[in-house]
């Protein structure tokens, strides 16, 4: 059994810190621990790895709060018009974010600085930071544990990481935790309408992390991405009212089958009950709601705040889509960018990933009908 108080004690001992700041997130942390204990059947590896993951989130919370206390000027750092990648999962958004991050003028959330935010990175040492080697060792271990991951996702510790991991440090975004553990009760609580005020607070923490990372390590033009922003876009906009969005698109059945397969392979390392049919049912309902929410927001705040990127085009000519994003938002497109993208493609050939919808209880005809509002809107 995982004990929440023991996790908090371990985080305090590792950091020498004890001030949790605005500690609202400790309540959902207790919810999560209860759900893991009652709903997840942890593997031997998971029994060790899951508590360590939770302690790491608490460590980041303690350290971020401490840096803001000692350097209140961090709170004055401006995060201006961040560009967020949204949309269904498994739409090519990870590859797209890696390519967007090739531009030195664009700031991304790199894997190594996401895993441990503090001390805040500095421009002079960002390429030699000791955390890079630590993160690389962890990545190599993970690839041995889940070898399928290398086929499913382009990876690299100096490449962009999904910023859902920052929301996880606020013990929000239940679907993100479900990548590792089976916690349906926690997931239901964090996606319920009454949780939105807490999601706003989670995004406020998200912004504090960006301020910390940008403070001594520009550039200041952020590109961030995670599909869960699609569900929580209202909360996001309350914290980032000038945000713009790149919306990646793919046929829903392919997207749902692929994300369920990805989660299933990840989960098997951590739990003995990966529940494939539950994954299909849960993600079908979740993403239907998420897409409808974002469509409503798009109608309200305007088409000019969004640009659409299509998986079918990206696999043929990704540079074309990146150029179009730059043009839409008025960014300068470097002359070298096409070459950088071509080089990235050579280093990251597309992997093979077979996902069978029926294994996850996904009925093709039913999915087609349920997502018709979306596929007809975007010509999928």
Residue ranges and their predicted role:
Residues 225, 236-261:
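Conserved phosphate-donor/acceptor-positioning beta-strand/loop module used by diverse small-molecule
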């Amino acid at each position: 059994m995982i004990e929440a108080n023991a996790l908090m004690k371990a985080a305090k001992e590792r950091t020498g810190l004890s001030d949790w700041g605005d500690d609202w997130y400790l309540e959902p942390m207790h919810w999560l621990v209860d759900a893991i204990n009652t709903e997840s059947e942890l593997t031997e590896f998971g029994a060790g790895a899951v508590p360590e993951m939770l302690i790491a989130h608490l460590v980041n919370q303690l350290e971020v709060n401490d840096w803001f206390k000692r350097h209140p000027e961090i709170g004055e750092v401006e995060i201006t018009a961040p560009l967020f990648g949204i949309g269904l999962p498994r739409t090519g958004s990870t590859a797209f974010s890696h390519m967007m991050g090739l531009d030195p003028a664009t700031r991304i959330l790199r894997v190594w600085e996401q895993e441990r935010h503090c001390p805040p990175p500095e421009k002079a040492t960002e390429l030699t930071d000791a955390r890079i080697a630590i993160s690389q060792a962890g990545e190599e271990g993970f690839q041995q544990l889940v070898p399928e991951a290398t086929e499913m996702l382009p990876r690299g510790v100096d490449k962009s990481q999904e910023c859902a991991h920052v929301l996880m440090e606020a013990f929000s975004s239940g679907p993100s935790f479900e990548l590792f553990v089976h916690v349906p009760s926690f997931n239901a609580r964090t996606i319920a309408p009454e949780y939105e005020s807490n999601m706003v607070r989670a995004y406020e923490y998200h912004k504090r992390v960006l301020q910390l990372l940008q403070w001594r390590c520009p550039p200041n033009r952020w590109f961030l991405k995670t599909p869960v922003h699609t569900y929580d876009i209202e909360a996001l906009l309350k914290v980032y009212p000038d945000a713009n969005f790149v919306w990646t698109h793919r046929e829903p059945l392919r997207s749902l089958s692929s994300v369920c397969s990805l989660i299933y392979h990840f989960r098997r390392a951590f739990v003995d009950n990966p529940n494939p049919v539950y994954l299909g049912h849960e993600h079908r309902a979740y993403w239907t709601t998420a897409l409808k929410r974002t469509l409503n927001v798009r109608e309200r705040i305007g088409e000019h705040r969004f640009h659409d990127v299509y998986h079918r085009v990206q696999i043929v000519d990704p540079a074309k889509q990146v150029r179009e994003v730059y043009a839409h938002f008025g960014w300068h497109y470097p002359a070298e960018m096409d070459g950088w993208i071509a080089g990235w493609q050579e280093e990251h050939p597309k992997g093979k990933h077979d996902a069978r919808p029926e294994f996850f209880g996904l009925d093709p005809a039913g999915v087609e009908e349920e997502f018709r509002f979306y596929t007809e809107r975007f010509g999928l």
